[in-house]
Amino acid sequence: MMELTEPEIQRYSRHIILQDVGGKGQLKLKRAKVLLIGAGGLGSPAGLYLAAAGIGTIGLVDGDVVDLSNLQRQIMHSTATLGEPKVESGRKTLSAINPDITVNAYHQLVDADNILSLVSQYDIVLDGSDNFTTRFLVNDACFFAKKTLISASMFRFEGQLTTIKPHQGYPCYRCLYPEPPPAGLVPNCQEAGVLGVLAGTMGILQASEAIKEILGIGETVADKLVIYDALDMKFRKVSRPKDPTCPLCGPNPKIKDLSLDYTVSCTI
């Protein structure tokens, strides 16, 4: 049976003394498997804190390499890893932070052919992608695999976050946005820009929600959309109800598999 070692008890002592965590909770974190879709702006801070928290297995999925323009916000990487696959750069960083965890690196883009095999190996999925088509693909795959999804996005000075778990009766991503917007209608981060530290804020919130889900503590945001405005320093929570006409999780679904045209419009 998996137990905490003496060094682990010392490493996670500030967790263990928390009434809502304790030794049993830390064991839950050790046994947990979390998949990060994207090892970039959101995946970097989320990965760092999940590794430090003692998540036993972390998966990194990204088909991109480290570019100089990434380093303004993607803190899992550095000048020394320019040109390396992001997942390999991230794997080295997370393993250096916590050598007791397992970090799996998948140097590939997610698509309809590989997404189900990836998410099925993990308990919770964090979506840090930078385009709508990937977000819809990840949402749909997690729905069919019955996996909890923590989704975040950012645009210029604003970030959004929600937890998605329709298998527990909550709304899915398509309840909020039934279809992706037309290609080119909404600029991505490469075109519109993004405040570097905003990635840290939203990625850490993703990690926090994932830890809460694993431990079964706190209030879920599965029926809320959290909106953060960095300029005005304001957080808002907007109600996100289930859509009875949702094409995926509604009573009369139109989407029954991953045969749609999920065209990735931007790197993650």
Language model regions located:
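Adenine nucleotide-associated cytosolic modules
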Residues: M1-I268
